Amino acid sequence: MSEPFMFEKPLGMRDVLPNLHSMQRKLGDRVLQEFRLWGYEQVQTPTLEYYETVGKASAISDKQLFKLIDFHGNTLVLRPDMTAPIARLVSSSMKDIPYPLRLSYCSSLYRALQTEGGRPAEFAQVGVELVGDHTASADGEMLLLLNRALIQAGLDHFQVAVGHIGFLNALFLEIFGTVERAELLRRQLYEKNDVGFKEQVKAFGLSSIDEKKLLKLSRLRGNEAILAEAEQLTESAEGKQAVAELRDLWQGLKEGGLTRYMKLDLSLVLHMSYYTGCIFEVYHDRLPRPLGGGGRYDHLLAKFGRPGPATGFGLRLDLLAEAVGKLEVQPKKRCLLYSRERRQEAYRKATALREKGMQVVLQDVAGVDDIDKMSASYEEIVYLIGKTEEGKR
């Protein structure tokens, strides 16, 4: 392996420059404020977790984990997601606080890359977890809150696809009996490869009835009308229960006046394997990939010794910033350029402006090589150079 150049960064790691950093921070603040209004309390978990606990409980594949060894020989991982760490937190430090719990976060996540592929290995995510509530009302709260958070962030023309992993699991079990062949179809659905899905279905050599069911599954996208079709596809109690839960959820969304942002997609599959019920994903025309998603995961907390139902979602701040495109007019950038004899005057003026909430840079003229180039970075320059009009220093 050749030595990296001084300016190179590890695979997938990126610098965030001031304008983008400021935008991501402001968007994160807006989203967190909306979470607070809904009663969600912000928490922070360590960047490093034990591989044997959070690492193995996480739905992120082992090859995507950044692993380290501590001085005692324990294998650690850089935090790959927030759901597993919060499950650990709820089951330990918060074990005496009764359910339901409403928690929020804004944290960096780390996932190792095999190739560059345009994806980051580190990214900031903002999200919520509602722990201890099994009802459809909790699922509805996630979708209502998701919509409000996106609107408050300044996003428009987004769409949320809503599905149910329990429906897919039930249908696949009815047709295949085992999970092996079903996993091949899940991969095609996750990649949204309709052509590959159809080819794989035909390659199985299924009965004409089962083949038609699977091909119809890939077209079950739209409004609540598709739920009647979905109910006819499945014969199991689990499959019909999943459809009933989606119908109940959709009714709640109608009551919240937010179905215009929603579509049902019974073929939806997400990256995380721990989902058990309603799942959803957010799309925007400006983005080549979903900017966030989430769903119900009722079995994860049991791995940490405190069983309980849960649901939640996360949004990537870098993708949210890309989708929003541009925030409202940014604060004016001002600079007080002063010489040494007027330094005290410059300090007073800067303090007065900052007390009014204005952004002000104080710059000693002796520290500037090219005043013209420096001035181009500011919308307003105030020169405090040389003696004052009264001749005072």
Curated annotation (Swiss-Prot):
Swiss-Prot/TrEMBL GO biological process terms: histidyl-tRNA aminoacylation; L-histidine biosynthetic process
Keyword line: Amino-acid biosynthesis, Cytoplasm, Histidine biosynthesis
Coiled-coil intervals: none
Subcellular localization, as worded in the UniProt entry: Cytoplasm
Pathway: Amino-acid biosynthesis; L-histidine biosynthesis; L-histidine from 5-phospho-alpha-D-ribose 1-diphosphate: step 1/9
Highest rank taxon of the organism: Bacteria
GO molecular function, one term: catalytic activity, acting on a protein
Keyword Cytoplasm in record: yes
UniProt subunit comment: Heteromultimer composed of HisG and HisZ subunits.
Family annotation (HAMAP family): HisZ (MF_00125)
UniProt protein name: ATP phosphoribosyltransferase regulatory subunit
Gene: hisZ
